[in-house]
Curated annotation (Swiss-Prot):
UniProt gene name: dapA
Active site: 133 (proton donor/acceptor), 161 (schiff-base intermediate with substrate)
InterPro entries membership: Aldolase_TIM, DapA, DapA-like, Schiff_base-form_aldolases_AS, Schiff_base-form_aldolases_CS
Annotated protein name in UniProt: 4-hydroxy-tetrahydrodipicolinate synthase
Biochemical pathway: Amino-acid biosynthesis; L-lysine biosynthesis via DAP pathway; (S)-tetrahydrodipicolinate from L-aspartate: step 3/4
Entry binding sites for pyruvate: 45, 203
Localization per record: Cytoplasm
Sites marked Part of a proton relay during catalysis: 44, 107
GO CC entries: cytosol
Amino acid sequence: MINGSIVALITPMNSDGSVDFASLERLVEFHIDQGTDAIVAVGTTGESATLPMNEHVTVVAQTVKFAAGRIPVIGGNGANATSEAIELTKSLSKVGVAAMLGVTPYYNKPTPKGLVAHYKAVAASTDIPQILYNVPGRTAVDMKPETVAELVAVSNIIGVKEATGDVSRVQRLRELCGNDFMLYSGDDATAREFLLLGGNGVISVANNIVPKAFKAMCDAALAGNAELAASIDEPLRGLYSTLFCEANPIPVKWAAHRMGLIECGHIRLPLTELSEQCHGLLLDAMTRAQIEVK
């Protein structure tokens, strides 16, 4: 099973909006070098909403190619039409991903019954492990632990990314879903507590720019060393909040560009590049986190 420090990888782009595959390869190498445990390709932070399906699949496939078996790659397969999610899942099943991460259908606000039916249909279209993804701040639907529990019996649904920031859900999910079901935090600010309460890993935005420190924090928390985890995590807390001064992934792409990790901080419309009033805030947070900028 995939656990530990997982990066929700940005998708680097050129100034004309095309995907910058040279920078993508460098990012993959960077995370392998820094000890990141796994990569999520083309999730929310990877701008899945603005990549058409053929491009989405290509980016995931290239990420797998660059990883070359050295780090697991999880492909984003969420969509708000079940038929589209199934089509995407079938395509991603051919490119070598270790698992897939499927966000709850957004905008159309399915009922719990609809969520269960959606995920069962998607899981039935592949043998590859599936991770559910609950982020109501983005989707306008909150998949409760009781709904997640209805999907545990599906053999290739292996876990859930819980991004509400409500750490009380860890215990409830564990009670309902059992010890073998993987619980991933999707909220950097509460990730340490999530792991200390029994979570298995974190799918992180900040991990794009502080992978070594984030990996060390996750390892300490998973080992039950709360004091060490806190000592690593506390200097990063300003970064966690500032990376959401505007909609993710606007700030983290700007930060990655300032670090020289990517050639350009371009982001696709309707998102726009980081506003000037946030530049100083983010630079200050990066300095406090001991991040070097170029």
